[in-house]
């Protein structure tokens, strides 16, 4: 897909053929999933004997997540006190969305219990799938806050060593050890830029205001990379940490907004995730692509708007944005179900016979 988007292959016919191949493989994967849908239903047995156990598991996950969500709220508040606003931007709204998903899950877990008591197999399966989807997305949102706290601690611990490694790179460049063939004026300009970046980061470290350690690492590694000396291990580590964090953040956002995010953001993120991240240059590319994918995904969500804006059903708009519900029935359903394009919406509300 990267080659197609960049205009390769060069011939229009070859590009069309490449796209036809991609579409064909996707269609075949969908057919295989559709063919296995009935077997998946049989394995889970949500309309019958498997429902009780599946409900117990979902309720257990729900209870654990409710406690983690409270802790994540406190964690995020502490991060906002300690770091610059940009540091927590990737998880802005995550705790609130997790709470919204859990409220939605509560309603459907309760409805599942009532359906089991009424021997309503269809209602049991439909409500339980909706609850499971909401719980799964709440876990992604809460885990994102917890993981970002870890990444920020790792980055803050790495910044001093990254500054030291960057200084060594600058010294090497000043002594003519750059691998790039640069004119003296260009080399001096790049050295001056890198000096300015490092000075700004040092000022942030010693200043009274909070700073963003991941952004500091991004600026350090990219400024020094332009000198092309041959990166030290600590700078590679820093670049990889930044890229990994961007990939994780973008993947979380796309996953919990899959009902609104379009193919462009998905393709770019998939491409970034598949690229082997070995060394700083590859890390820069992955970081850039992941951030671009996140930006495209956010644009898609804004363009989509809030579904069912007048609903009184708690959590319904978020469930539709998240792709938990497919918005094909009047109540926002059916819930997305394991299968391909022809079967993933098979849990429709059945019309009275």
Task: Cite the ranges covered by each PLM segment.
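Long, charged/polar, soluble alpha-helical segments
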Residues: 1-353
């Amino acid at each position: 897909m990267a080659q197609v988007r960049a205009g390769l292959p060069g011939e229009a016919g070859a590009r069309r053929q490449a796209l036809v191949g991609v579409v064909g493989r996707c269609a075949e994967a969908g057919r295989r999933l559709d063919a296995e849908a009935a077997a998946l239903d049989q394995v889970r047995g949500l309309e019958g004997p498997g429902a009780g156990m599946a409900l117990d598991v979902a309720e257990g996950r729900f209870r654990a997540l409710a406690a983690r969500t409270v802790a994540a709220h406190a964690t995020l508040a502490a991060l906002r006190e300690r770091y610059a606003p940009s540091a927590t931007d990737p998880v802005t709204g995550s705790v609130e969305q997790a709470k919204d998903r859990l409220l939605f899950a509560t309603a459907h877990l309760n409805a599942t219990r009532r359906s089991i008591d009424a021997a309503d197999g269809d209602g049991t399966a439909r409500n339980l799938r909706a609850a499971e989807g909401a719980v799964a997305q709440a876990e992604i949102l809460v885990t994102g806050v917890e993981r970002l706290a870890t990444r920020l601690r790792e980055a803050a611990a790495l910044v001093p060593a990254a500054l030291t490694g960057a200084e060594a790179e600058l010294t090497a460049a000043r002594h003519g050890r750059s691998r790039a063939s640069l004119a003296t004026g260009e080399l001096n300009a790049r050295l001056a830029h890198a000096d300015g970046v490092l000075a700004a980061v040092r000022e942030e470290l010693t200043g009274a205001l909070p700073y963003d350690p991941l952004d500091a690492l991004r600026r350090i590694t990219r400024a020094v990379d332009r000198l092309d000396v041959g990166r030290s291990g600590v700078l590679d580590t820093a670049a990889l940490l930044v890229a990994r964090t961007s990939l994780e953040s973008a993947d979380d956002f796309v996953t919990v907004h899959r009902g609104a995010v379009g193919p462009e953001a998905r393709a770019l993120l998939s491409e970034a995730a598949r690229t082997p991240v070995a060394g700083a240059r590859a890390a820069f590319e992955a970081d850039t692509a992941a951030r671009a994918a996140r930006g495209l995904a956010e644009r898609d969500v804004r363009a989509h708007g809030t579904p069912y804006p007048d609903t009184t059903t708690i959590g319904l708009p978020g469930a539709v944005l998240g792709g938990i519900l497919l918005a094909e029935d009047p109540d926002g359903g059916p819930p997305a179900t394991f299968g391909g394009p022809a079967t993933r919406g098979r849990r429709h509300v059945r019309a009275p016979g």
